[in-house]
Amino acid sequence: MWSRSSLRRLTATVSTVPESPSLQGARLYLCTDARRERGDLADFADAALAGGVDIIQLRDKGSPGEKAFGPLEARAEIDALHVLAEAARRHNALVAVNDRADIARASGAEVLHLGQDDLPLTVARQIVGDRVIGRSTHDLAQAEAAIAEDVDYFCVGPCWPTPTKPGRAAPGLDLVREVAALNTTKPWFAIGGIDAQRLPDVLDAGARRVVVVRAITAAEDPRAAAEQLAGMLDSAV
């Protein structure tokens, strides 16, 4: 059986006009830091995207690179996003910016992701125009608000506690079940502590799209890790 990532690569070899990357078709969303302490962002991104990642977001907050070198300044963030964009073009994927509407516009990224306490949506929309905007949600009321407001997708979680968001309580899979029961047509992603071992439980709860971090960023073979997750998501469709 062909995996989604294999079909995407096959299509790229036989078509002279690549299909535009699509939020609607996106199922595997990766958040990565700039990997400054490793210096391998380009190779890592290429491997993860080749494995089937559909959206790759740069989020450097709390990263080893931040601890070693300090916060990622705007110019450096834009440079890192350009590295991701180059890889994303090769693999027909989308690039996302965390929090910063100005950085999204300056870098040309297709996606801006906002938390509950970030820039107001109306202001963000004025800055980024018709780019894709996503929203983090942590309870049912926030998810229902995201369905109603002018965002293009939303994330639901954390499903499990995660070091990416220290101190944040995890509403768990009950929230995933509640959101799945809403039967919204707006794309949404489960997030928080998800890996290949936990993904079946997330799928059983009703999610069909997920955001991962360490499941790929900490993997010895990022491409293989992405392929495994993408294959599991494909099988659940």
Curated annotation (Swiss-Prot):
One annotated GO molecular function: magnesium ion binding
Recorded hits in CDD domains, A to Z, give: TMP_TenI
- Provide one Gene Ontology biological process annotation: thiamine biosynthetic process
SUPFAM superfamilies registered for this protein in UniProt: Thiamin phosphate synthase
Q: Which residues bind 4-amino-2-methyl-5-(diphosphooxymethyl)pyrimidine?
A: Q57, L58, R59, D60, K61, N98, S136, K165
Query: What keywords sit in the KW lines?
Result: Magnesium, Metal-binding, Thiamine biosynthesis, Transferase
Q: Where does Mg(2+) bind?
A: D99, D118
Say yes or no: keyword Magnesium present: yes
Query: Pathway membership of this protein?
Result: Cofactor biosynthesis; thiamine diphosphate biosynthesis; thiamine phosphate from 4-amino-2-methyl-5-diphosphomethylpyrimidine and 4-methyl-5-(2-phosphoethyl)-thiazole: step 1/1
Q: Which residue positions does the secretion signal occupy?
A: none
- Tell me which InterPro entries the record gives: Aldolase_TIM (IPR013785), ThiamineP_synth_sf (IPR036206), ThiamineP_synth_TenI (IPR022998), TMP_synthase (IPR034291)
- Listed GO CC annotations: cytoplasm
Keyword Oxidoreductase included in the entry's annotation: no
Obligatory cofactor(s): Mg(2+)
Which EC number(s) does UniProt give?
Answer: 2.5.1.3
What reaction(s) does this enzyme catalyze? 2-[(2R,5Z)-2-carboxy-4-methylthiazol-5(2H)-ylidene]ethyl phosphate + 4-amino-2-methyl-5-(diphosphooxymethyl)pyrimidine + 2 H(+) = thiamine phosphate + CO2 + diphosphate; 2-(2-carboxy-4-methylthiazol-5-yl)ethyl phosphate + 4-amino-2-methyl-5-(diphosphooxymethyl)pyrimidine + 2 H(+) = thiamine phosphate + CO2 + diphosphate; 4-methyl-5-(2-phosphooxyethyl)-thiazole + 4-amino-2-methyl-5-(diphosphooxymethyl)pyrimidine + H(+) = thiamine phosphate + diphosphate
Q: Any note on cofactor binding?
A: Binds 1 Mg(2+) ion per subunit.
Chain residues that bind 2-[(2R,5Z)-2-carboxy-4-methylthiazol-5(2H)-ylidene]ethyl phosphate: T162, P163, T164, G193
Q: Tell me which PANTHER family the record gives.
A: THIAMINE-PHOSPHATE PYROPHOSPHORYLASE, THIAMINE-PHOSPHATE SYNTHASE
Family of this protein: Belongs to the thiamine-phosphate synthase family.
Quote the function comment for this protein: Condenses 4-methyl-5-(beta-hydroxyethyl)thiazole monophosphate (THZ-P) and 2-methyl-4-amino-5-hydroxymethyl pyrimidine pyrophosphate (HMP-PP) to form thiamine monophosphate (TMP).
**Per its record, how is this protein called by name?**
Thiamine-phosphate synthase
Record organism: Mycolicibacterium gilvum (strain PYR-GCK) (Mycobacterium gilvum (strain PYR-GCK))
Organism classification: Bacteria, Bacillati, Actinomycetota, Actinomycetes, Mycobacteriales
